[in-house]
């Protein structure tokens, strides 16, 4: 745990008592603050009280007594409307911050030279974050991994010289971190997502940009320039005097890092030098993973990791669950079917990465639809032998696929998985792929994408003749 001493002797309100909120309560109390905890969920209030915290309805308390409101990232700060706690805090002149802000203040106060790597982007954050941590551990670094990827940042070990924190950050977390100042900041990409919480894509992109704009003096901003928002951000941040590493998998850069399916290259003016090979690494298959690997490579090279250790670490990286996870193979008379769990693909842009990585696809898609549908995936339709549509999006997706891709409305994973497996086995293809890449949120049928992917894995492993990869 990281004790938060910056509010010692003061009263702090914490709203939202899930994993990061409860961790904030513990860290603030350990640092000497008085914590008043609140949540709309009564069970979480009870849990906090049992853990020894004062719980109260913050509506009934004088807000001028609070030094800060620590807000969980899931609570609206601005859109579609500020949460009532935010309005109360603003009326009383109380700052509204999140758990990563508490970390940044502790690091600045106690270990300002301790390396801190922060990663954001619409897609690829978790894989890139996990890969950076893996590479640094391979290099022998004392590495703490957390943030949006799982472990609450304040539950990690405290910053100190020689210890690096590798932290995935969502746009919600960045919004609550005004002092964000990583040693290395990474902005992978920006595509339309979370507009319900940010109002416009321009505001969403501006929030993402703050992570790389805030890199501390002498640090490195690594920015994907394959979208217009990244290109503009790189130019602005470079003009502000920061060290910018431009990253691309679509075209050349003058200074920066590029990648394709085979290798990662460092570019310095007219000179391009290979720093690592990617060919044959199954956990980093696809051009989207080449981008993730390029970002991770740029980060660890900036911290002093050698190309030799980088290559070893890339080859030993196991990948992440629910992100193009190869969960099994089924050997048939005519071919071998590969089953791939890409449940994390909760929008069309993410699903495009998986569809581009395979041929002869038996595609399981659908769930709670997002704006834009799947028309943007039309260039990949020739790769799809048949689609199996589930959830609320089934009828909408069927209308898009009509006359272009054979489909059936399966409604559930329980129906889709055996149907896709049967059709793949009977297709006569040498290497058919049953791919769960939903292009939708999971909330119509599952609490989160992890449970959706876990259910897919269970259904696949229950099929006759399926062996683990």
From Swiss-Prot:
Q: Which positions bind ATP?
A: 121-127
Q: What keywords are annotated for this sequence in UniProt? A: ATP-binding, Cell cycle, Cell division, Cell shape, Cell wall biogenesis/degradation, Cytoplasm, Ligase, Nucleotide-binding, Peptidoglycan synthesis
Q: Which InterPro entries match?
A: Folylpolyglutamate_synth_CS, Mur-like_cat_sf, Mur_ligase_C, Mur_ligase_C_dom_sf, Mur_ligase_cen, MurD
> Which GO annotations describe the biological process of this protein?
cell division; cell wall organization; peptidoglycan biosynthetic process; regulation of cell shape
Answer whether the UniProt record assigns the keyword Nucleotide-binding to this protein. Answer: yes
Chemical reaction(s) catalysed: UDP-N-acetyl-alpha-D-muramoyl-L-alanine + D-glutamate + ATP = UDP-N-acetyl-alpha-D-muramoyl-L-alanyl-D-glutamate + ADP + phosphate + H(+)
The terms under GO molecular function for this entry are: ATP binding; tetrahydrofolylpolyglutamate synthase activity; UDP-N-acetylmuramoylalanine-D-glutamate ligase activity
Please name the SUPFAM superfamilies in this protein's record: MurCD N-terminal domain, MurD-like peptide ligases, catalytic domain, MurD-like peptide ligases, peptide-binding domain
Enzyme Commission code: 6.3.2.9
The record's GO CC annotations read: cytoplasm
ATP-binding as a keyword? yes
Biological or metabolic pathway of the protein: Cell wall biogenesis; peptidoglycan biosynthesis
**Subcellular location per the Swiss-Prot or TrEMBL entry:** Cytoplasm
What is the similarity comment for this entry?
Answer: Belongs to the MurCDEF family.
Q: Which HAMAP family match?
A: MurD
Instruction: Name the PANTHER family on file.
Output: UDP-N-ACETYLMURAMOYLALANINE--D-GLUTAMATE LIGASE
Q: State the protein's purpose.
A: Cell wall formation. Catalyzes the addition of glutamate to the nucleotide precursor UDP-N-acetylmuramoyl-L-alanine (UMA).
Q: What is this protein called?
A: UDP-N-acetylmuramoylalanine--D-glutamate ligase
Which organism is this entry from? Rhodopseudomonas palustris (strain ATCC BAA-98 / CGA009)
What's the encoding gene here? murD
